């Protein structure tokens, strides 16, 4: 009987105690459903030691559940960060696509205008050409092309005009900013080689086109009232006047043209990665720079201005002057293109370039008249 009363007295009625605070209490404002099930769903043994083991298991389960919830929230945050990063990358790609499409469309419009002008000029020249004279002159085309560099003209004047025109056309141009930005991220020597190589090839192509137009005019001259008119010189004057007026209008109207050119150059350069060392990295930088500058320069103002100068001036003088102008502008870009803007205004450079276009057009007109 005494043992029965002792055993009955040891049966203390159980009251669910408050679980101790855990390290994960700050991550949740209320106990989770799994922790409530862990505390109240199962009958609690009477013995204190057994009860302590039970609470230890509950706390272990509680920590496990809270860890899973915390990890899930971290996973959600990582997903959100990845989503934002992906969205920013897609937005950058869309901006780059729009930039490339607009640049291609602008170059295409310029090329279409010039080709339309050349087509009209060629049609007028053919209409004013004597058929018998044209037929007799066609066999001399090969001989004219072979001796194409025999008529060199005044090399000094061609050099001076090409140097001044190209130098002031390239300062502040997109090609200038591309060279400056690439030189800030890569070796200045490799960037100069790639940029100058692309501009040199472009200059040779422009001079060949200009001289071809010049010798076609010699084979099929334009006759007006018994007088032969130099249609190549007239076309050169029209091109120079067109680019001179357009440059001056851009200088007057476009306040943020330099910023726009710089942003386009930054987007173009952001797609190139020339990091590394050694011969392979230098070759990759040269090839990437060459391709980027060649595409950016094709159909540009300096491209057609070189064609116009080559059609009316000495080809060797134009090549030497254009290469010297491109080399000087590229050297300034790779050595300190960002510092140049502190001393020269983009609008002032545009005014000088536009005036030079008009001056050379006037000089060509004077040569035609005399």
Swiss-Prot record:
Residues 135-161, 210-228, 297-315, 370 are lumenal, thylakoid. GO terms for molecular function: calcium ion transmembrane transporter activity; magnesium ion transmembrane transporter activity; manganese ion transmembrane transporter activity. GO terms for biological process: calcium ion transmembrane transport; calcium ion transport; calcium-mediated signaling; photosystem II oxygen evolving complex assembly. Residues 74-113, 183-188, 250-275, 337-348 are stromal. GO terms for cellular component: chloroplast membrane; chloroplast thylakoid; chloroplast thylakoid membrane. The keyword Cell division does not apply. It is found in: Plastid, Chloroplast membrane; Thylakoid. It is a multi-pass membrane protein. Residues 22-38 have a biased composition (Low complexity). Disruption phenotype: Defects in photosynthesis and reduced growth rate. Pale yellow leaves with reduced PSII activity. Altered Ca(2+) and Mn(2+) partitioning in chloroplasts and reduced Mn(2+) binding to PSII. Residues 1-38 are annotated as: Disordered. The keyword NADP does not apply. Residues 1-73 form a transit peptide. Pfam families: GDT1 (PF01169). The chain crosses the membrane at residues 114-134, 162-182, 189-209, 229-249, 276-296, 316-336, 349-369. Keywords: Chloroplast, Membrane, Plastid, Thylakoid, Transit peptide, Transmembrane, Transmembrane helix. Belongs to the GDT1 family. Homodimer. Mn(2+)/H(+) exchanger, which transport Mn(2+)from the chloroplast stroma into the acidic thylakoid lumen. Might be a chloroplast-localized Ca(2+)/H(+) antiporter. Regulates Ca(2+), Mn(2+) and pH homeostasis. Required for chloroplast development. This is Protein PAM71, chloroplastic. It comes from Arabidopsis thaliana (Mouse-ear cress).
């Amino acid at each position: 009987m005494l043992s029965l009363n002792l055993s009955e007295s040891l049966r203390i009625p159980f009251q669910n105690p408050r679980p101790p605070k855990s390290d994960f209490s700050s991550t949740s404002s209320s106990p989770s459903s799994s922790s409530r099930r862990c505390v109240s769903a199962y009958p609690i043994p009477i013995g204190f030691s057994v009860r302590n083991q039970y609470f230890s298991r509950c706390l272990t389960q509680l920590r496990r559940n809270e860890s899973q919830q915390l990890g899930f929230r971290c996973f959600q945050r990582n997903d959100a960060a990845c989503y934002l990063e992906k969205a920013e990358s897609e937005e950058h790609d869309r901006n780059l696509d729009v930039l490339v499409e607009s640049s291609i469309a602008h170059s295409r419009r310029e090329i279409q205008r010039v080709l339309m002008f050349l087509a009209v000029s060629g049609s007028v020249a053919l209409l004013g050409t004597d058929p018998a004279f044209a037929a007799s002159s066609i066999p001399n085309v090969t001989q004219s092309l072979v001796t194409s560099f025999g008529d060199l003209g005044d090399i000094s004047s061609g050099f001076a005009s090409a140097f001044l025109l190209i130098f002031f056309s390239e300062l502040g141009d997109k090609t200038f900013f591309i060279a400056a930005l690439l030189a800030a991220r890569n070796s200045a020597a490799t960037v100069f080689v790639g940029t100058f190589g692309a501009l040199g090839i472009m200059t040779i192509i422009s001079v060949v086109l200009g001289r071809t137009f010049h010798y076609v005019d010699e084979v099929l001259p334009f006759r007006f009232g018994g007088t032969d008119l130099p249609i190549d010189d007239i076309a050169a004057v029209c091109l120079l006047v067109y680019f001179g007026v357009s440059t001056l209008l851009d200088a007057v109207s476009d306040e943020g043209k330099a910023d726009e050119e710089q942003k386009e150059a930054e987007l173009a350069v952001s797609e190139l990665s020339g990091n590394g060392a050694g011969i392979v990295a230098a070759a990759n930088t040269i090839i990437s720079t060459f391709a980027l500058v060649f595409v950016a320069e094709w159909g540009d103002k300096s491209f057609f201005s070189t064609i116009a100068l080559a059609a009316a001036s000495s080809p060797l003088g134009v090549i030497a002057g254009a290469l010297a102008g491109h080399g000087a502008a590229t050297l300034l870009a790779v050595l300190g293109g960002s510092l140049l803007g502190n001393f020269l205004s983009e609008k002032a450079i545009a005014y000088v370039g536009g005036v030079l276009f008009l001056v050379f057009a006037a000089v060509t007109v004077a040569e035609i008249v005399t």
